[in-house]
């Protein structure tokens, strides 16, 4: 299950607790809308039920065909033997000519597309929600390098917690064992 997320310098503001009259304020030094784009996948080995989180980071960029193709190469390198079935949404970059070239060059790679407007079926969306709206909520970051480091730290923490990854997979209504 693959998808992309944008981690923004302006924080995701969530409700929090504070004593009456002491309203918490998230100070943000920038009005720029810089971000780090992260294509990623929650990968499952069906034979073993082993889960992994694969992520690439593209500071101050959008995920276009070139980045999607580079991510496919990353997935193929991580899983060098056997078939690779990748499920993702209908982003235009996923259907770009360069992505089609990668698929044509690697017959063991098969792409499957989710129905439009179905993020709840994608385990990667659950990972993005955890990272962006829970772990990084109410936290302003001043520069792009710091934003990338913070996103990487939280995604690495999620990747290291196999029970949490499994819950993201199950949250999308998917089984982790055959």
Language model: regions and residue ranges:
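Extended, low-complexity cationic-aromatic segments
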Residues: 1-73, 172, 176-177
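A generic "structured core" feature
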Residues: 75, 111-112, 152
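C-terminal anion-handling pockets and recognition modules
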Residues: 125-178
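RNase H-like polynucleotidyl transferase catalytic core
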Residues: 24-31, 107-123, 140
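Acidic/histidine-rich, metal-coordinating catalytic segments
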Residues: 2-3, 82-94, 117, 122
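Short, solvent-exposed loop/turn segments at secondary-structure junctions
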Residues: 9, 94-95
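Generic structural signal for small/hydrophobic residues in well-ordered secondary structure
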Residues: 3, 40-42, 72, 89, ...
């Amino acid at each position: 299950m693959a998808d992309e997320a944008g981690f923004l310098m302006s924080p995701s503001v969530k409700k929090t607790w504070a004593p009456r009259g002491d309203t918490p304020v998230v100070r943000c030094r920038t009005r720029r809308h810089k971000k780090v784009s992260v294509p990623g996948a929650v990968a499952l080995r069906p034979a073993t039920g082993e889960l992994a989180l694969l992520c690439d980071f593209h500071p101050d960029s959008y995920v276009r065909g070139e980045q999607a193709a580079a991510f496919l190469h990353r997935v193929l390198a991580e899983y060098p033997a056997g078939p690779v079935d990748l499920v993702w949404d209908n982003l235009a970059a996923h259907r770009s000519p360069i992505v089609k070239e990668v698929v044509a060059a690697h017959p063991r790679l098969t792409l499957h597309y989710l129905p439009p407007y179905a993020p709840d079926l994608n385990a990667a969306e659950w990972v993005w929600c955890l990272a962006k709206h829970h772990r990084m909520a109410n936290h302003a970051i001043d520069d792009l390098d710091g934003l990338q480091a913070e996103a990487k730290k939280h995604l690495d923490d999620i990747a290291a917690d196999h029970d949490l990854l499994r819950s993201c997979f199950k949250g999308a209504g998917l089984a982790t064992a055959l």
